[in-house]
Amino acid sequence: MARLAPDGAQFDARQYDSKMNDLLAADGKDFFTSYDEVYDSFDAMGLQENLLRGIYAYGFEKPSAIQQRGIVPFCKGLDVIQQAQSGTGKTATFCSGILQQLDYGLVQCQALVLAPTRELAQQIEKVMRALGDYLGVKVHACVGGTSVREDQRILAAGVHVIVGTPGRVFDMLRRQSLRPDYLRMFVLDEADEMLSRGFKDQIYDIFQMLPTKVQVGVFSATMPPEALDITRKFMNKPVRILVKRDELTLEGIKQFYVNVDKEEWKLETLCDLYETLAITQSVIFVNTRRKVDWLTDKMRTRDHTVSATHGDMDQNTRDIIMREFRSGSSRVLITTDLLARGIDVQQVSLVINYDLPTQPENYLHRIGRSGRFGRKGVAINFVTTDDERMLFDIQKFYNVIIEELPSNVADLL
């Protein structure tokens, strides 16, 4: 097992104590700068082509409010404080900002992301890897409860990004397994949660071991005094972006889930539903444009009359399809999140999330269709084993309970 660095090596306890005293005595830059630019599409943000490919492949079509405001300043290298509820797309915001700036020819740790829990760190790692799939990003989660030796082996082989919990990351820094020489970006995710768990000292410990010039991003649902202390100590003229949660409601909409276990069982489940229920009009949401086309084809080969619309179609075609759907000449519409906010059909009695949304905030915009104008509606969510975490996050985000679909669902429509 690797030992801690001896006296005289890179980790110098006396120098550490001296730097920590300087840090705690410093008052930092206690002011914010404003940043008002809003980008309505990912294409307008000036991102690398292969990053855009990863974003679209992951299922994002239109940036959320925090992404519209927060990705570009991070990409520009500015220190940022982004305050928004969990589930609004913060993770993809800083992941995109990091992925845009990495030097992929240099296989050294250039970005460090701290998260309060092992589960969140592993979730961030998964998103980072997915968005950076076409860029060849090397990312690793350093968290407690896993093999220290395995962490050391992976770090020695080289990574671009480390995501981790404060305890394990500090341990890796102390052991010199994680060398901060090339580190340019430092992100604190769910900063308020991290501070409430007592990680303040460890965050300070880690920060003062990083290079002097490092870009800092702080992401948090709330901004308690301790979080503001961090911004004062570590950040230079940070851009502050505040996004409030949508003031929409799920009232009057009955929400259920169907445990389909595996992705390949969704189609049979969907067809069974349409054969047993008398549905006036319904909307089916999937996460990618390609899947819209695939599902439309599958439904039509089984003699279901469906319409489909997504962002690759020109506006004129989309308008014609929507007119047909509103008039009732087509009863089933298959679409993506991009169009969720524009479907204002009163007669829609059922929304089916064939895929759960990639961000909890989009759930509201999808199923809100069926409850507009005081009409009641039903939302049915198809849930695979991999979706269970997202279903939990959605229930927590909206403070709702989504029950398993009962056998008498026909009586509810």
UniProtKB/Swiss-Prot annotation:
Family: Belongs to the DEAD box helicase family. eIF4A subfamily.
Domain of life: Eukaryota
Root EC class: hydrolase
Organism: Nicotiana tabacum (Common tobacco)
Listed InterPro entries: DEAD/DEAH_box_helicase_dom (IPR011545), Helicase_ATP-bd (IPR014001), Helicase_C-like (IPR001650), P-loop_NTPase (IPR027417), RNA-helicase_DEAD-box_CS (IPR000629), RNA_helicase_DEAD_Q_motif (IPR014014)
UniProt name for this protein: Eukaryotic initiation factor 4A-8
Record lineage: Eukaryota, Viridiplantae, Streptophyta, Embryophyta, Tracheophyta
Alphabetized Gene3D superfamilies for the sequence: P-loop containing nucleotide triphosphate hydrolases (3.40.50.300)
EC number: 3.6.4.13
Function: ATP-dependent RNA helicase which is a subunit of the eIF4F complex involved in cap recognition and is required for mRNA binding to ribosome. In the current model of translation initiation, eIF4A unwinds RNA secondary structures in the 5'-UTR of mRNAs which is necessary to allow efficient binding of the small ribosomal subunit, and subsequent scanning for the initiator codon.
